């Protein structure tokens, strides 16, 4: 089970991973918080493993979740995560929210990572670097506090790395929207400053490279 946290791009990364893994395996996607109902795979709203198994007979990728009060969104499945972990070859969980902003800091109750998750991938949008903390970050006051900068200061690679290091929430960092020479330079700088493996690229273009 892999949990995906961080800034904007989580749903896109989840789909990219699901599409790749589905070439040779069954993949279950879900959320531990809220996510938009995917239109690219069957959605099981019945909280039963039998319903998930039936869906896998029709598609290698299945989404499981319950309808919530927000139109067009799903909540977590009505099943124990341990049971879900055994329902597919791979389970991908969107475990965070960022209000479509490229970067974020996490409050005490975030992210909502299932205890049985074996890997946590954090998404950071390189387009947030250079913007002010107040404009680029979800929970900007907390981000500024962890980075040791004013909330109106620009986000630098050093500030981003400081927040990621202080939180210590992820196993792998994925830097998204790296689509120019300048963006690659910034991504490489972030990779130099963090202690975890780093993959960077553009989900939109289907390009990526391992930087660390």
Residue ranges and their predicted role:
Residues 1-4, 59-71, 95, 146-148:
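Short, basic, glycine/proline-bearing loop/turn elements
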Residues 200-212:
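Short, basic/aromatic-enriched C-terminal tail that caps enzymatic domains
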Residues 1-22:
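Walker A (P-loop) phosphate-binding motif
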Residues 4, 27-32, 63-66, 91-95, ...:
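General beta-strand structural signal in soluble alpha/beta enzymes
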Residues 58-62, 86-91, 119:
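Loop/turn-to-beta-strand initiation segments
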Residues 18-71:
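N-terminal phosphate/diphosphate-binding loop that engages ATP/GTP or pyrophosphate donors
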């Amino acid at each position: 089970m892999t949990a995906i946290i961080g800034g904007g791009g989580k749903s896109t990364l989840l789909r990219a991973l699901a599409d790749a893994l589905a070439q040779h395996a069954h993949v279950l996607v879900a959320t531990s918080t809220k996510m938009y109902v995917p239109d690219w795979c069957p959605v099981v709203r019945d909280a039963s493993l039998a319903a998930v198994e039936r869906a896998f007979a029709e598609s290698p990728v299945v989404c499981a979740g319950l309808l919530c009060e927000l139109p067009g969104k799903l909540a977590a499945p009505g099943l124990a995560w341990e049971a879900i972990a055994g329902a597919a070859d791979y389970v991908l969980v969107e475990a965070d929210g960022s209000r479509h902003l490229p970067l974020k800091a996490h409050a005490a109750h975030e992210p909502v990572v299932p205890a049985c998750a074996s890997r946590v991938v954090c998404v950071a949008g390189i387009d947030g670097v250079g913007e002010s903390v107040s404009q680029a970050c979800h929970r900007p006051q907390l981000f500024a506090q962890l980075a040791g900068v004013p909330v109106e200061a620009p986000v630098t690679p050093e500030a981003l790395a400081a927040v990621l290091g202080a939180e210590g929430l992820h196993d792998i960092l994925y830097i998204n929207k790296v689509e120019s020479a300048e963006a690659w330079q910034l991504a490489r700088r972030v990779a130099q400053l963090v202690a975890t493996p780093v993959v960077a690229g553009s989900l939109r273009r289907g390009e990526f490279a391992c930087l660390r």
